[in-house]
Design a protein with these regions (language model features):
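Conserved phosphate-binding elements of NTP-dependent enzyme cores
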Residues: 1-939
Length: 939
């Protein structure tokens, strides 16, 4: 078998027709500057071709249900194995997905509880034992005399299928009636069931009237039912509540029966286990009054109510018509702060009133007076949410919603019968609420009887193995019940990595995208050991990574570069780490060997002497902490994964400031008080989300330089002669754009069983504009030519137009000189998108009162890119602004003016402030993991 993956002529995106050989069954790291072509080679070429080959082996019918897979632009790839991609995308936004379900641990837990779980009475918590037929007969006979009942034998419960044989067998056995999905059918008629729907089938064994002398017949009928159903009987009480009895489990005191324990009883995604009140979600979403009225010190006239459609306060608005009617009816002033209004009146504004109010109709609606009820702002939003078919409207209203626990199951998702089954004294919900670390310890110390051990040995082995894998990738602080949608990209990737190890596949090509993201240096060694274990199983690992420790641990390194974008796309180096350290042409080698370094600042900023102070922060695992954030400094919030950094910065500080300064509709996490907001004028969160989701979004439109370029073209003599305004040069509006492709430059061609093809528009040849618009030139270049220029070329071209040159130079300063001015947003990496946002902030006039918040800005960045990023962040802080960063990268941490270190551990073991101060002060703290790893970087 070939021992290499041989790639010839790879040209995807910016790759320059490269040839490369990668050893199989090795731990291979691909590195290079952001935008150099690493992902283009690893994901868009190698993985894409592996997936495409697999999909082409399937039938056309199967391919119809799978996503499209384009053939990458490469001549050939030999030696390719089946490929599995583990990228940074969040696992699932489905509220039913949890850490337990994604890792399959929850499936094993359900099986464990079904096999060795001990049922208890949901009322008295007494351990439940089996019921005898005599006990069941006595309880049925206790029904009121004259009550009509039917004895039903369940033969199918909530399963898909047609069940023709079962129905035929019932007919031949002499039964006359059957209840299917709640409807009674005569067995003599032809019954056809939908095989794709779940059905419940119950045979009507007997029909009785409760009276003296029926015990003998009832006993015989129950024995018949139990012989058919396996110990379960459903008593259909005519005009009464249905009863279920089991020979298996029942509480003698409260007559509560529990069906035979099965895995589906413990599934919140199955109606047989899910809480019927919340259908297994554990929470309800509702309009939150605190989001509708975020600042209760404002009056109605000052805009206390922020809801969509209810915040227009002009005299002629419909909202003001309603508000005035309420004020007149209840004798209040619309200038009174909302918090000072009587509670009854506050509720009228929010929830409406059945009392008829006098509305003075505005002139535009015909004038006059009308009498009617007011449904209330919250009720109005809920009605609009249910009735609207517009995703935009629904998303807008969802921004006013928050979640509350289901009052029935208290957020546990399961029905009370399922929650009354325990193993080791804990029900399944209590067990999944433990952290992975505590759950692992629970199974280490679990005392079972000899019989229970025999039954559960293999199940517990699988559970412990999977919990161990999660511990080894640094996720021991997560709860198994944690919603998958709340995980960061790095966390979800490491969960999938742990799941893959659990599957024990061999001969597979795994492609990973920066698995170290979000991981503290302390946990990095465990992650590297996990990846090596995956390799030792007989797999090939290709890891796109910038982390020094990961590169040093690799068997083979491929360095793509030398620059980024048009300056990248070549293989600068391919070989072992030892050879890379000696390679003078590799920027990676320069930083890894220490030939180049990010310097430690000679002195730290003193700040402006003012503070943003947070008191009593208690969101998630934060333990009622107080923290002072010095303003006018570059600040890093550090700590191991799960220590509470995001809870403090993103959930509390950012959301509170966004509401206070930017009038955002967000609900901040739990805290008592935040002071010092008056020292700030705005908060800006600079993340790695795309700058736009369509090809029409690009760096020029995002930074605003495109507006200046369009205005410049409108001032040319050609444009003036034709009467063109700046709008003529927009590809988002009719007039100047090519209407064949509506300004996209490409047209989608559907190929049905083959992938859709995106072809350049035949009319404009991909230039986006019509012929007349492209005839307008500035210095010999059309608007399309300008958009095709790199930023570096643009700076030279517009050097005499300061307004344009200044904005383009800020893109240069953040290291984006290689990207095209009009490069589609969809082709920018996360790091590139973040730097476009940073450049936009740099181009604005500094007020010195802005706080910038960045969550791991080094994601996807090479050491050389990190160097440039630090210079940009320092410029923002030099202008008197505050820069607050959540970061694990020690090169960033060492240049900070102030560090807030949380810990000591993750999850329940975190949420406290270990130490605050300069990097030099942090390294003196013996309890700080950050301090230990930071020390060598300051020497």
């Amino acid at each position: 078998m070939i021992d290499k993956i041989i790639i010839k002529g790879a040209r995807e995106h910016n790759l320059k027709d490269i040839d490369l050989e990668i050893p199989r069954d090795k731990f291979v790291v691909m590195t290079g500057l952001s935008g150099s072509g690493k992902s283009s080679l690893a994901f868009d070429t190698i993985y894409a071709d592996g997936q495409r080959r697999y999909m082409e082996s399937l039938s056309s019918y199967a391919r119809m249900f799978l996503g499209q897979m384009e053939k990458p632009d490469v001549d050939s790839i030999d030696g390719l194995s089946p490929a599995i991609s583990i990228d940074q995308k969040t696992t699932s936004k489905n509220p039913r997905s949890t850490v337990g379900t994604v890792t399959e641990i929850y499936d094993y837990l359900r099986l464990l509880y079904a096999r060795i779980g001990i049922p208890h009475c949901p009322v008295c918590n007494r351990e439940i034992t089996q019921q005898t037929i005599d006990q069941i007969v006595d309880q049925i006979c206790d029904l009121e005399s004259g009550t009509k009942i039917q004895l039903l034998a369940p033969i199918v419960r909530g399963r898909k299928g047609k069940y023709t044989k079962e129905l035929e067998h019932a007919r031949k056995s002499g039964y006359v009636r059957v209840r299917i999905d709640g409807i009674i059918y005569d067995l003599s008629e032809e019954i056809t069931l939908d095989k794709n729907k779940k059905h419940t089938i119950e045979i009507v064994v007997d029909r009785l009237v409760i009276k003296e002398g029926i015990k003998s017949r009832l006993t015989d009928s129950l024995e018949t039912v139990f012989s058919i159903s396996g110990g379960i009987v459903t008593i259909d009480v005519i005009d009464g509540e249905e009863l279920t009895f089991s020979q298996n489990y029942a509480c003698p005191e409260h007559n509560i029966s529990i069906e035979e324990l099965t895995p589906r009883m413990f599934s919140f995604n199955n109606p047989f286990g899910a809480c019927p009140h919340c259908t297994g979600l554990g929470v309800f979403r509702h309009i939150d009054p605190d989001i509708i009225v975020p600042n209760k010190n404002l009056s109605i006239r000052e805009g206390a109510i922020k809801a969509s459609g209810w915040n227009t306060l002009d005299k002629g608005s419909v909202a003001m018509m309603y508000y005035t009617a309420i004020a007149n009816e209840y004798g209040i002033s619309l200038d009174t702060p909302f918090c000072e209004l009587p509670e009854e009146v506050q509720n009228v504004f929010l929830y409406g009133t059945d009392q008829k109010l006098e509305f003075k109709i505005i002139e535009s609606f015909g004038g006059g007076v009308r009498y009617g009820k007011f449904e209330g702002v919250i009720n109005n939003l809920e009605r609009r949410y249910k009735e609207s078919n517009s995703s935009y409207s629904r998303n807008e209203i969802e921004s006013y919603m928050s979640e509350t626990l289901c009052p029935e199951c208290k957020g546990n998702r399961l029905k009370k019968e399922s929650l009354s089954v325990t193993v080791g004294g804990l029900n399944i919900s209590q067990l999944t609420a433990l952290s992975v670390r505590d759950c692992f310890d629970f199974f280490e110390n679990l005392n079972l009887t000899e019989r229970q051990q025999f039954i559960s040995r293999q199940i517990i082995k699988e559970i412990r193995e999977r919990l161990g894998f999660l511990k080894n990738v640094g996720l021991d602080y997560l709860n198994l019940s944690r919603s998958a949608g709340t995980l960061s990209g790095g966390e979800s990737q490491r969960i999938r990595l742990a799941t893959q190890i659990g599957s024990s596949l061999t001969g597979v090509l795994y492609i990973l995208d920066e698995p170290s993201i979000g991981l503290h240096q302390r946990d990095n060694d465990k992650l590297i050991a996990t990846m090596k274990r995956l390799r030792d199983l007989g797999n090939t690992l290709i890891v796109v990574e910038h982390d020094d420790d990961t590169m040093l641990a690799a068997d083979y390194i491929v360095d793509i570069g030398p620059g980024a974008g048009v300056n990248g796309g070549n293989v600068v180096f391919a070989g072992t780490v030892d050879k890379l350290l000696k390679c003078k042409n590799s920027v990676t080698g320069d930083y890894l060997s220490g030939r180049k370094k990010i310097p430690v600042p000679a002195k730290r900023r003193k700040g402006n002497g003012k503070f943003l102070s947070v008191k009593g922060a208690s969101e998630h695992n934060l333990k009622n902490i107080n923290v002072d954030i010095p303003l006018g400094k570059l600040i890093c919030v550090t700590g191991v994964s799960g220590s509470g950094k995001s809870s403090l910065v993103n959930e509390i500080i950012y959301k509170h400031l966004a509401c206070k300064l930017n009038r955002a509709k967000l609900k901040a996490g739990n805290f008592k008080e935040i002071t010092g907001c008056e020292h700030l004028d705005k908060v800006i969160n600079i993340d790695q989300s795309p700058i736009g989701r369509t090809p029409r979004s690009n760096p020029a439109t995002y930074t605003g330089v495109f507006t200046d370029i369009r205005e410049l073209f409108a001032q040319t003599s050609d444009a003036k002669a034709r009467g063109y305004s700046s709008g003529r040069f927009s590809f988002n509006t009719k007039g100047g754009r090519c209407e064949a492709c509506e300004g996209d430059g490409i047209i989608k061609i559907e190929m049905h069983f083959l992938p859709d093809i995106y072809a350049p528009c035949e009319v404009c040849k991909g230039k986006r504009y019509n012929r007349e618009t492209l005839e307008v030139h500035y210095k010999g270049k059309s608007i399309h030519d300008v958009l095709e220029m790199t930023v570096d070329e643009g700076v030279q071209f517009f050097e005499h137009i300061p307004k344009i040159a200044r904005k383009l130079k800020t893109l240069q300063e953040v290291g984006l000189g290689y990207i095209k001015i009009g490069q589609p947003a969809t082709t920018l990496s996360g790091g590139e998108a973040q730097r476009v946002k940073l450049s936009t902030e740099l181009s604005k006039r500094a007020t010195g009162k802005t706080i910038y918040i960045l969550d791991e800005p080094t994601t996807g960045l090479h050491n050389a890119d990190v160097h440039k990023l630090i210079e940009v962040l320092q410029k923002l802080a030099d202008s008197g602004n505050t820069v607050l960063i959540i970061e694990h990268n020690l090169n960033v941490i060492k240049v900070a003016d102030h560090i807030i270190d949380l810990g000591k551990e993750g999850g329940d073991g975190g949420g406290e402030i270990l130490v605050c101060g300069t990097p030099e002060e942090i390294v003196k703290c013996e309890d700080s993991y950050t301090g230990r790893y930071l020390k060598p970087y300051l020497e």
